Amino acid sequence: MKYNFDEIIDRKNAKRSYSTKWDDSARKARKYGFGETFPEDKICLQTADMDFKTAPAIIEAMKEVSEHGIYGYSAINDEYREAVCHWFSTRQNWHFNPEDIMHCNGTHPALVECIKRFTKPNEGIIVLTPSYSYHDDIENCNRIFVGVEMIEKDGYYTIDFEALEKALKNENNTLFVICHPHNPTGRVWNKEELTQMATLSRKYNVLMVSDEVHSDIIRKGITFYPMMSVVGSEGLITLTAVNKTFNLAGLSCTNIIVQDPKIKEKFNGYYSLPNPFGVAAVIAAYTESSDWVDALNEYLDETLKWCYNFINEKMPKAKCIIPEGSYVIWLDLRGYNLSDEEIKHKIINEAHLVLQGGSNFDSIYGQQFQRICIPSPRSMIQEAFERLYKVFE
């Protein structure tokens, strides 16, 4: 393979790492239930970033910025905008104009910007659950989190459109956040699902925000359809980013894509200043690193197949599916008839794994689930799953 995704890179002790995922502080140890210190042999698979070096072209571009020696106020230029348009037109057959792009320093800030501009305090924000951590963003804006529980069968999730319509019909609910691909279930919404969500949202005049930051991480044989390319731009904002695709979350480069003139008008006065490393990274990612993403997806596909087979063969009481998109496994441990606390004890105190408990995604129906982020060298993932097997079987 041209790129070495098997390389083990020290993110815990490296002088310039600054990794929150591998942070060894007492504060982080307490947060995850380890007491005051982490065990030396911990394996961290709780955060949706990768333990792989980013694409070589991106590293070289940032070296050039570093050598320039001036890191002043920066802006996204024509080259940046054209690079974004090029990527989505060639990779996802989604066409929009350079002037439809607004930069934001991160996906959470982008969502918060949308919430504050288009909703009022105490209004409801609809989210399909189990859900990625939009909860804090919504409540910190003094809005109400309105969860719509999805239907689960053998690990596969579908939308309960009857429940969704009931939520959309409530006049106090004014915004619908759609995670596509869905985190943590791994669903990639098909054209029919996207169309039905949009039709219902427009029927009840509810603005849609489609979070598509995982959209480049798609299984072989699965087609990702950008929501805006399927349903049109009316009443829809899309968020995209290089962070998940290229392991660049620390550069905080999210794009807000808006084509609807009425929505654009409400963004009048908005501005966001990127850092120069982020601008260079986005351009290099979207114009020189397509083959790296293809190789990454092949590697992740093989890792996910290995994980799925391991669970089926060695831990038959557990359930998971290979996600259609993203690089997270939503592991169902209900078959062991253990409480959520007992499951956490085994994972933390016996297996020495740092995972993310399902209750973070759904306080009721997420109990006895764990989210596992697998974009790490396969040997690390295999060791983590062997530990799970030892403590549960």
Per-region residue spans from a language model:
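Conserved PLP-binding catalytic core of the aspartate aminotransferase-like
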Residues: 300-301, 314-350
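Helix C-cap/helix->beta junction micro-motif
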Residues: 142, 203-204, 234, 351
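PLP-dependent aminotransferase class I/II
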Residues: 76, 235-313, 319-323
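Conserved core of the PLP fold type I
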Residues: 71-199, 216-217, 222-230, 237
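PLP-dependent enzyme catalytic core of the Aspartate aminotransferase-like
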Residues: 346-354, 361-393
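N-terminal small-domain helix-loop-helix segment of the aminotransferase-like
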Residues: 2-5, 9-106, 287-288
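Conserved active-site segment immediately N-terminal to the catalytic lysine
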Residues: 221-243, 262-266, 353, 370-371
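Walker B catalytic acidic pair
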Residues: 212
